[in-house]
């Protein structure tokens, strides 16, 4: 099939998927939705899924990208929240957990007026697939105002579009509907970070050993495993420049010379780099929030950009980072 036909087919199916998502997805439906077993779905976005994800995100128990699906990341966040509140953990939303989450009674959505800054760009025409092709780009910015706004509010682009039929994301002054994840305040100061290489999760604990934050992650691989044992945070670098070392031997990267990729949200390590006390390893962001915890990394710990920024705000130089290899309970497999 010629490239043009493929592109048109992809665009058509994306349009159909967005239209299907938009059906029944509005502020009133989200605000009134109760996250019962029937109202949640792993495969499709639902108003109840959006409301649940928003409540978890506000509590610093991140479901990753808010897309309205009750997928693995949302389920992991739900179990971690129950653990933190010393409530029975379950893959379903219990009455006790839902009551605790609703202590934050703000509406799950709000309106936002697009600013000149939101549409200023410069935007990339296309994000190169190969790292080598990124090295000559002066800034690894967003590909569109829609992508920028979706990340700003921790949302998938599809959900943002579904909530705003007919709206233009590239017009300053346009008022749009977004999920309300709050002011982005960081969790309390973390005394310890715990990274589970099996479950692909990041947890923050305070001095009393209370669980104060949870984030889904992509952690290592068989080819490029993450470290073991206890490391420490050595540097916190917002908007990092990515430096590729040929000694990494990343699959798909053929350069035999070092090269660097300039900062930006679509930089390979996103908007934040938290350096660890093992050469070449860190906790960082990503250009692909939709893939978090659904694949593996090159050995580092990959989070959504907004979650990497929240972790960075909660740790400091010297904070211990413990790598564990938890085993899934039989029922959770």
Residue locations for each model-derived region?
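Gly/Pro-biased beta-strand-loop elements
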Residues: 186-286, 317, 329
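Boundary at the C-terminal end of the N-terminal hydrophobic targeting segment
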Residues: 19-24
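N-terminal targeting pre-sequences for secretion and organelle import
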Residues: 306-333
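Extracellular LysM carbohydrate-binding repeats and other cell-envelope/extracellular binding modules
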Residues: 72-119, 161-192
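Primarily a LysM-type cell-wall glycan-binding module
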Residues: 42-76, 118-154
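Bacterial N-terminal signal peptides
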Residues: 7-18
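Solvent-exposed, polar/charged alpha-helical surfaces in well-ordered, non-transmembrane soluble domains
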Residues: 47-50, 54, 72-80, 95, ...
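Secretory/export targeting leaders with adjacent low-complexity proregions
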Residues: 135-216
């Amino acid at each position: 099939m010629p490239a043009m036909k493929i592109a048109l087919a992809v665009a058509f199916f994306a349009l159909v998927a967005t239209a299907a998502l938009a059906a029944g997805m509005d502020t009133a439906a989200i605000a009134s939705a109760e996250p019962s077993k029937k109202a949640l779905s792993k495969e499709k976005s639902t108003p109840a899924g959006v409301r649940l994800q928003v409540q978890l995100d506000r509590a610093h128990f991140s479901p990753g990208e808010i897309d309205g699906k009750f997928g693995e990341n949302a389920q992991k966040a739900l179990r971690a929240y129950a653990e933190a509140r010393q409530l029975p953990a379950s893959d379903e939303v219990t009455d006790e957990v839902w009551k605790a989450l609703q202590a934050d009674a703000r509406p799950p959505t709000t309106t936002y007026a697009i600013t000149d800054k939101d549409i200023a760009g410069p935007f990339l025409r296309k994000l190169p697939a190969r790292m080598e092709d990124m090295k000559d780009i002066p800034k690894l910015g967003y590909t569109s105002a829609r992508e920028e706004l979706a990340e700003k509010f921790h949302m998938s682009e599809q959900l943002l579009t579904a909530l705003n039929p007919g709206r233009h994301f590239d017009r300053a002054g346009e008022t749009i509907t977004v999920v309300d994840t709050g002011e982005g305040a960081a969790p309390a100061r973390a005394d310890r970070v715990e990274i589970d290489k099996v479950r692909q999760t990041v947890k923050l604990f305070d001095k009393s050993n209370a669980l104060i934050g949870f984030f889904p992650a992509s952690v290592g691989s068989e080819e490029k495993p993450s470290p073991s044992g206890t490391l420490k945070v050595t540097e916190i670098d917002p908007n990092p420049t990515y430096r590729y070392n040929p000694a990494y031997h990343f699959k798909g990267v053929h350069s035999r010379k070092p090269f660097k990729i300039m900062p930006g949200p679509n930089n390979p390590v996103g908007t934040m780099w938290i350096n660890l006390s093992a050469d070449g390893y860190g906790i960082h962001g990503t250009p692909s929030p939709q893939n978090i915890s659904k694949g593996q990394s090159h050995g580092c710990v990959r989070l959504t950009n907004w979650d990497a920024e929240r972790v960075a705000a909660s740790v400091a130089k010297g904070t211990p980072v413990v790598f564990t290899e938890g085993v899934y309970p039989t029922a959770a497999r």
